[in-house]
Amino acid sequence: MQVVLVTEMASSLKIWVIVLTLLCILCRLLVYRKDVSWREFMKQHHLSPSREFNEYKCNVLMREQEALKDKSSHVFIYVSEYKIGGICINGNWRDRYRNTYVWLQNALKVLRCHQENDNNGYTESRSFDYVEFHCGTDGHVDSIEDLKMVEPISD
C-alpha cells in the first residue's frame, strides 16, 4: 500500500512539474511577444544615426534583408532608437498609447526606395517628412502608417 502511494505521489509530482514548466514558458512568450513586432519594425525601417544619412543606399538595404527582397517599394526612417521608443509613451513612461496612431511632431529624414522598371535596382528619394506611426496593442511602434513630405533633401 505504501509503495503504491509513493509511486502515485511521484507520478503526480512529475505531472505538476511539467504543467508548471509549460506555464512558465507560456508566460515568457506572452511577456516577450511585444518585442517581436518592435524588433521587426526596427530591423525593417530604422536607419541608425551612427552613420551619415547619405551613406545609406537602397540597393544595399533592400538586398540585405530577406523580408524586403521581393518588395517593390519601402520606407526607411533616420532617427535614434531612443526617439522611436518614446513615440507611444503618453506622458508617464508607464502609460502607453495602445492600438492607436500617433503623428510625430518633428519631421524626420526619410529614405524611400522604389524598384526600377527593369527590376535591376532601386531609385531612392530622400526627404524630411512628418511620420504617422501605429502603436500596437503592446504599446510599442509596429508600423509606419502615413508620411507627409515637408521638404526634399538634395544630394
Question: Predicted regions: what is each one?
Answer:
Residues 2-110:
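N-terminal "domain-start" segment
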Residues 88, 113, 135:
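Short cysteine clusters
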Residues 94, 108-123:
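A domain-level detector for eukaryotic transcription factor DNA-interaction modules
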Residues 116-155:
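Compact beta-sheet-dominated globular domain cores
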